[in-house]
A protein has these predicted regions:
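Short, amphipathic C-terminal "tail helix"
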Residues: 639-652
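SAM-dependent methyltransferase catalytic region
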Residues: 2-375, 381, 403-407
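C-terminal effector/catalytic modules and regulatory tails appended to multi-domain proteins
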Residues: 31-37, 613-617, 640
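C-terminal substrate-recognition regions of SAM-dependent nucleic acid methyltransferases
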Residues: 78, 82, 90, 299, ...
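Short conserved catalytic/interaction loops centered on acidic-Pro-aromatic/His motifs
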Residues: 221-224, 588-592, 641-642
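A structural signal for short hydrophobic/aromatic patches embedded in well-ordered alpha helices
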Residues: 95, 208, 576, 644-645
Length: 652
């Protein structure tokens, strides 16, 4: 059976509870739409306009729908704006189970124990304490972590006994431990008052409020065999409007509220700044007082959440001029979550675990060095969690507990075998990294001499990239290249690049390109990105890199390639190329290669070898034999060797 939110809306309206559920306790007005998804219906549906009963009933009945019922175009628009990905029920269940394991200090989630009878509490962990445990879902959307009335992907109703949300679990405890209606209502309200969520968009917030109040309704009806009355739900509705509030989680303010603020005479002065939206207020029910939400971030605050859980927005596509790039914002929500609770469990992109992606490198390292952080689950293929969604680097469920020390992650891989290999390799003598001899794809640059000789060249290049020896430079500036080595008085480099989607060589005057440390040396060359090569585990086995080749002195490359080494003799370059082709080296490269890019930093854990005749490796052997020498050098056992040879494809 599918959920029908409109039926809930009409039922609540008939009981006089719909209007109260539209209240914004901070502004004293109604919650705002905070989305342009309904603008086609007129200005009353603008993002800064209030949601009223008249706009969601009568002629507009059916306008508010769950995610599963929304028109495809609306889903697409909303998903793009803040890169929403909707949390599947099984993920909600796993994450909520873990919070219960932490609270109960025992294995198995609360709902699993319910199938065998009542939830087991004791004198140290009472059901009343469980009910009053303060838990918050950030950016809650329709509230999947709070209540699971239906499957968010399909809209199918979930039977009460199989629901797994935070409030579902509390209401279950209330039903099992109370004997009268009045006692049940008393503790159900306490459960509500200790369950929180905030959301940016008004329609989603309204749905989450409806889901919460209707979950109380359905739990009451199941326990007592009759529907609750309006008066019995009045306190519950009040708690819902305080505890589920509208907020921009990055500013702690009511979204778009300043567009509704009346201007004072002072505001009309020429230099006056527009008023900012008000900071959101929430209620501390234990002290019967309200606080600005931002005050919870202070060290001396009297109110903190016991647990924070959620699935924050991943990126913001509403800002910036680059249509191909949307800045990440999930790390900002992580930072803010750590300020309001000692214990935080979130699902989010995992690229930072490999010090990759667009989150700040300093932030990535801070997270990797944090002894209070652990990764509960890692999914290299994000579509395992979010169908039809591609997230480079995968997604992770992280758990942060300020009062526990798990040891810093420092280096993350999802495979135990790779972790042990990594420890052996890094701990083998004084570790030197291959990263030191890898040259970035942007090593070569055009010169002022070229621009002086070809003053119109700048107009043929991208803005801000007048000196880039770009991947498409052969097509962009054909006038500075020759197919064959010219017979004139100038000196030339042979440049490897791509033309008409194929590798090719062209000649360019030396004075048009800067010289690097390996320009006049032998070097190993690889494509700077190779999506088909894959990563460890995707596919199995994976190549990790493309095919390497040797370039000699006076050979250079466009930005399509990286180069490795600066060798005086070709034999050493050949030895390095053999090493790059080993399964061992590509496995170590795979520790940090979670996207198709192969920049120098990805080679951090590939150990540098001696490529001269004095090496402890006999480079005259085949690549397969060199692999065996490397396995022995680093003391790898059969299980570790088997992991490498099953996960990384052989290269001759």
């Amino acid at each position: 059976m599918l959920i029908h939110i409109q039926d809930d809306i009409l039922r609540l309206q008939g009981m006089g509870l719909l209007e109260p559920l539209l209240a914004d306790r901070t502004t004293g007005r109604n919650i705002l739409w905070a989305t342009d998804a309904y603008l086609e219906h007129g200005s009353r549906f603008a993002r800064n306009a209030p949601i009223t009963t008249a706009l969601i009933t009568g002629e507009y009945a059916g306008l508010i729908r769950t995610r599963a019922r929304k028109a495809f175009e609306q889903q697409s628009q909303r998903t793009k704006a803040r890169a929403e990905v909707f949390t599947p029920l099984w993920v909600v269940s796993q994450m909520a189970d873990y919070l219960d394991e932490v609270w109960f200090q025992r294995k198995a989630g609360i709902h699993k124990q319910y199938a065998d009878g009542h939830i087991s509490f004791n004198t140290n962990k009472t059901w009343q304490q469980y009910v009053e445990n303060r838990r918050l879902e950030i950016t809650c959307g329709e509230g999947p972590f709070l209540v699971s009335r239906y499957d968010a992907a399909t809209g199918e109703v979930i039977p009460l006994e199989k629901r797994v949300g935070l409030l579902d679990r509390k209401l279950r405890a209330v039903s099992e431990n109370t004997d009268t209606v009045s006692d049940w209502l008393h503790w159900a309200v306490k459960a509500l008052r200790a369950t929180y969520g905030y959301e940016f968009q008004g329609d989603s917030l309204l749905i989450s409020r409806i889901n919460v109040i209707m979950s109380v309704w359905e739990a009451f009806e199941t326990r007592w065999g009759q529907a609750p009355t309006a008066s019995q739900l009045r306190k519950a509705a009040e708690a819902v409007t305080w505890n589920l509030w509208q907020m921009d989680g990055l500013t702690d303010r009511v979204p778009y509220a300043r567009e509704n603020l009346q201007l004072s005479l002072f505001d009309l002065l020429p230099d006056a700044k527009p008023p900012l939206p008000p900071y959101c207020r929430i209620k501390n029910w234990r002290q019967q007082r309200t606080n600005q939400f931002r005050s919870l971030k202070g060290e001396r605050t009297r109110m903190k959440f016991d647990f924070v859980i959620g699935n924050p927005p991943y990126q913001d596509e509403t800002i910036g001029d680059n249509k191909g790039f949307a800045p990440p914002i999930y790390h900002l929500f992580i930072n803010e979550s750590y300020k309001i609770a000692n214990t935080v469990e979130l699902i989010h992109p995992a690229r930072f675990l490999f010090n990759a992606g667009s989150t700040p490198k300093a932030w990535n390292q801070k997270m990797l060095d944090d002894p209070h952080l652990r990764i509960l689950n890692y999914y290299a293929d994000a579509s395992e969690v979010f169908p039809n969604t591609s997230i480079n680097g995968g997604v992770a469920v992280s758990y942060h507990d300020e009062q526990s020390s798990f040891g810093a992650i420092q280096i993350f891989t999802k495979y135990n075998e790779l972790n042990t290999i990594l420890r052996k390799v890094v701990g083998h003598g004084p570790f030197e990294t291959m990263e030191e001899i890898v040259y970035t794809r942007t090593s070569y640059k055009l010169t002022d001499k070229m621009h002086n000789d070809y003053p119109n060249a700048k107009d043929q290049l991208s803005n801000g990239h007048a000196y880039d020896f770009a991947s498409n430079i052969f097509d962009r500036l054909p006038q500075i290249f020759s197919d064959d080595l010219p017979n004139d008085d100038h000196e030339y480099y042979r440049a490897l690049g791509r033309k008409n989607n194929a590798r090719t060589y062209m000649y360019i005057r030396k004075e048009y390109i800067n010289k690097t440390a390996n320009t006049d040396k032998y070097k190993v060359v690889l494509a700077k990105a190779d999506g088909a090569a894959g990563q460890i585990g995707s596919p199995v086995p994976a190549r990790i890199t493309g095919i390497s080749m040797i370039l000699g002195p006076n050979d250079i490359t466009t930005e399509s390639f990286i180069s490795i080494g600066s060798f005086e003799v070709e034999a050493e370059a050949n030895n390095a190329m053999k090493y790059v082709r080993t399964r061992f080296a590509r496995t170590m490269l795979g520790v940090l290669k979670v996207t198709q890019e192969l920049g120098p930093q990805k080679w951090k854990y590939v150990p540098l070898q001696d490529f001269t005749p004095n090496s402890d490796i006999d480079w005259s052997q085949s690549v397969a034999d060199i692999d065996r020498q490397l396995y022995a050098k680093y003391g790898l056992d059969e299980k570790e060797i088997s992991f490498i040879e099953t996960h990384v494809k052989e290269m001759a």
